[in-house]
């Protein structure tokens, strides 16, 4: 069976989009394709002017590193690294110099209200603080597109809404933000809702 079937979708720069659907509907697969973590077996996918489906593995890796930041449901933080060290990882991968890394990280941590948590391990932080660390890590490389897979799924309602407000603020700064959620209340906080069922797009609020 196909995870996605006959999906046709265009997302403009600067949109704030929710991809909504039940578990197993194909929404996470769609996010992985958008994020260059998975390749469709048929059809084409363009990111800006690059045809990702025809690009080499190294080109796709470069696109992913330069253009995309990820936020996951269970934070995906390294348990034995401090908050600061977790946020530093993508900058190390990009060979950013130490002094510049420090400047970027501290600026993001201050902006997200987690500067006082910088030397803490993830296990010593609340879920909301851990998700803020994950968001900071997604932002430090100045990615154009932020992808968030169930970013509020492991949080209580109040903290989940705070995280969504943060993503909204990030979107207003000019970044494209795409979230996957099964929560209608969360989806309604975005500007556009795409609904997926059994691998097909069955609703797009932009077309109303």
Regions picked out by a protein language model, each given a short descriptive name:
Residues 193-205:
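H-loop (His-switch) and adjacent beta-strand-loop-beta switch element
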Residues 1-196:
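ABC family nucleotide-binding domain
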């Amino acid at each position: 069976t196909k995870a996605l079937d006959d999906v046709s979708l265009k997302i403009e720069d600067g949109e704030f989009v929710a991809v909504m659907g039940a578990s197993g509907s194909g929404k996470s697969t769609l996010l992985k394709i958008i994020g260059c973590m998975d390749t469709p077996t048929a059809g084409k996918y363009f990111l800006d002017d690059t045809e990702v489906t025809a690009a080499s593995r190294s080109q796709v890796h470069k696109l992913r590193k330069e253009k995309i930041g990820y936020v996951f449901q269970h934070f995906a933080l390294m348990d034995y690294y401090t908050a600061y060290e977790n946020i530093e990882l993508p900058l190390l991968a990009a060979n950013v110099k130490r002094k510049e890394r420090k400047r970027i990280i501290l600026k993001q941590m201050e902006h997200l209200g987690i500067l006082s948590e910088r030397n803490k391990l993830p296990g010593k932080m609340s879920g909301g603080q851990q998700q803020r660390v994950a968001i900071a890590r997604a932002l430090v490389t100045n990615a154009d597109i932020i992808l968030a897979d169930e970013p509020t799924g492991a949080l209580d309602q109040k903290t989940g809404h705070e995280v969504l407000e943060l993503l909204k603020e990030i979107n207003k700064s000019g970044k494209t933000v795409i979230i996957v959620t099964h929560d209608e209340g969360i989806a309604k906080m975005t500007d556009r809702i795409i609904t997926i069922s059994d691998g097909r797009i069955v609703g797009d609020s932009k077309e109303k």
